[in-house]
């Protein structure tokens, strides 16, 4: 069961990578809502985007990703794996979300954003690294504590719903 749950986490991580790839398909400015305010302001100043477009893309990203990711993990844990009760649901949700978080931190942030030019926005190179050490600390903290909280909330909701 653990291997299956890890594979489901890899699947969620692959969905994240796919969403990012679609978001930057016409250039990284398409995902500038994920960058610091300084990078966003520079992109607006350079005429690459507008505050309204940044806001719209951010809302669209959240509207697609949050329900999509929640739906995916709930289908995996409760629909496919047949979890019953809080503990079974919680550990599976936590593993899936943690695997996705590791892929996000190491593959997306660490390698793709940090070591390739795919996420470079022309005219903002002087603002690199786009993900600072402080940003990384926050992401790691939220990724560990935050995913545990999300897993607990979803498991509690599903336990109440099922029983």
Which residues are covered by each model-predicted region?
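Interfacial loop at the N-terminal end of multi-pass membrane proteins
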Residues: 15-58
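Juxtamembrane non-transmembrane "cap" segments at the membrane-aqueous interface
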Residues: 105-125
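Core segments of transmembrane alpha-helices
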Residues: 58-78, 139-153
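Hydrophobic alpha-helical membrane-embedded segments
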Residues: 6-30, 96-112
């Amino acid at each position: 069961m653990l291997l299956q749950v890890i594979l489901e986490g890899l699947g969620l991580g692959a969905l994240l990578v796919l969403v990012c790839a679609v978001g930057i398909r016409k250039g990284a400015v398409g995902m500038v809502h994920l960058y610091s305010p300084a990078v966003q302001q520079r992109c607006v100043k350079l005429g690459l985007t507008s505050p309204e477009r940044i806001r719209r893309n951010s809302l669209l990203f959240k509207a697609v990703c949050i329900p999509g990711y929640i739906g995916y993990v709930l289908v995996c844990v409760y629909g496919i794996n047949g979890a019953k009760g809080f503990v079974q649901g919680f550990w599976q949700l936590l593993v899936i979300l943690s695997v996705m978080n590791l892929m996000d931190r190491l593959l997306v942030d660490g390698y793709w954003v940090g070591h390739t030019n795919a996420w470079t926005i022309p005219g903002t190179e002087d603002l690199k690294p786009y993900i600072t050490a402080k940003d990384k600390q926050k992401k790691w903290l939220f990724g560990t504590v935050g995913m545990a909280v999300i897993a607990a909330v979803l498991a509690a909701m599903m336990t109440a719903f099922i029983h």
